[in-house]
Amino acid sequence: MSVSVCPCGSGNLLDACCGHYHAGTPAPDAQALMRSRYSAYVLGLVDYLVATTLPAQQAGLDRAAMADWSAQSTWLGLEVESAEVLGGQPEHSFVTFTARWHDQDGDHQHRERSAFVQHAGRWYFIDPTVGLKAGRNDPCPCASGHKFKKCCASYVGN
């Protein structure tokens, strides 16, 4: 049992916060998933980062680069600005945040508006660096059963 404070910035203990999600409990919303992913980078949990990325994108992830970035960075904090459920589509959400870290090149911060989709009771991060191969009339890669153009097309940079 961990007695450390969760890296996500909640002030809660890891086991009472993101540790639940790292152990397999589905995150209840996109913001909780995003916070748990930040914590996973801090803790070097690359398998969790891959598992919580949209399944259609997982094969395109660079696991070694993710592990290197995680290990070679000193994580300085996370600030969540907003979490938005998108109009009429509660299974789609954006979370805007700023993550700060230090590496051999100095201090950095990254502000992002990340897209998330919920499918079969689990939230997934839609990685903007990994393309989705889908035509507008093809089934959506998120496995929602909807056409891509009516589902995730507007949330990814295809």
Swiss-Prot record:
InterPro entries hit by this protein: NTF2-like_dom_sf, SEC_C_motif, UPF0225, YchJ-like_M
Pfam family, one: YchJ_M-like
Record-annotated disulphide pairs: none
Family: Belongs to the UPF0225 family.
PANTHER family according to UniProt: ADENYLATE CYCLASE-ASSOCIATED CAP C-TERMINAL DOMAIN-CONTAINING PROTEIN (PTHR33747:SF1), UPF0225 PROTEIN SCO1677 (PTHR33747)
HAMAP family: UPF0225
Protein name: UPF0225 protein Pput_1155
